[in-house]
Amino acid sequence: MTIHSLEDLPAEGVSGRGVLVRSDLNVPLDENGVITDAGRITASVPTLKALLDGGAKVVVAAHLGRPKDGPDPKLSLEPVAAALGEQLGRHVQLAGDIVGTDALARAEGLTDGDVLLLENIRFDKRETSKDDGERLAFAKQLAELVSPEGAFVSDGFGVVHRKQASVYDVATLLPHYAGRLVADEIRVLEQLTSSTERPYAVVLGGSKVSDKLGVIESLATKADSIVIGGGMCFTFLAAQGYSVGTSLLEKEMIDTCRRLLDTYHDVLRLPVDVVVTEKFAADPPPQTVAADAIPADTMGLDIGPGSVKRFAALLSNAKTIFWNGPMGVFEFPAYATGTRGIAEAIVAATGKGAFSVVGGGDSAAAVRALGISEGSFSHISTGGGASLEYLEGKTLPGIEVLGRPQPGQTEGGGPA
């Protein structure tokens, strides 16, 4: 699929031009509102800097969390504006609203090389509305912030699988381009789906089988092996007839897991041992047991050392690796060993020439939390859900729209 890229925009000249950029600045905050992981802010900088250095008047739209009933002071983008300004090396204005009088006045007052961050885009319910008309009306107001002759740059890969006003609808109204982050993500994922060097190993973790079912079924016919860890492995173990104690279990998915094991028994790889404890907390003493001998009064919170050793050996021979989801509750030091072991095995394989992709979300957070160099992997995605849906073969609305003719053009590129 051919999409319009950011490299096409400077050719037309951005100096003095208003550019609306949809970034993914959805960073985690602690109880005091302090950013605990600025990875997504860092990832947004190259596109913004390129536009600002070119003299564009940049208006940034982004969200934080999931506001339920309109504006929520705890989800204001104020700390994000400060952090973004530090990384850009210039002042970032924060509008007090999204498309209201403050945002309009600030947008009109921008000079070349200025940047304005709108308040949390999801404070307006129309952003995520299922009603096409509501979303389009909101998108038109967003487009007005960079009119006349405005442009739209999509650089929030973590939201391109959402059909939302600032992701999809605004791209139907303005000349649209993929930012550097989005273009790079697409290039990497295309490599995982169309030009994969084998052996191809996939590592899947996280809590629920239901969240990963689509990608398991899609990749089981493409990958040479799929390692299953994290909370989801216990539903697979239960499908084999094993008792899993009080471990996380999706009973409604047991039959599905049994079918997957029957169909893809030569591809799926399950843990041979797990680390268990009596309650979900950081302090109870951990115990390593065989995967088929989990005590009834315990829950599994990590894969065991035997599993790490077996999976690491498999990964050492891989030429392509995709990893999405931690192997255990890495936030608790006693149950981070499995995730660390798998991460280090992928790093080692990468050092030997393997192409490795960390599929965003909790996996990327785990890499940073465990102090593992991000540069040790070939690519760390900023979009967990978007990456999975792309690999499933789904159409991502925010990507599909970037391949459409620019407003006023036909499919052939000429005027309408």
From Swiss-Prot:
Q: What GO CC annotations are associated with the protein?
A: cytosol
Where does this one sit in the cell?
Cytoplasm
Signal peptide annotation: none
Under CDD domains, the record lists: Phosphoglycerate_kinase (cd00318)
Record has Transferase as a keyword: yes
Q: Which Pfam families match?
A: PGK
| An annotated GO BP | glycolytic process
**EC number(s) on file:** 2.7.2.3
Q: How does it assemble?
A: Monomer.
Q: Of which family is this protein a member? A: Belongs to the phosphoglycerate kinase family.
Designated name of the protein = Phosphoglycerate kinase
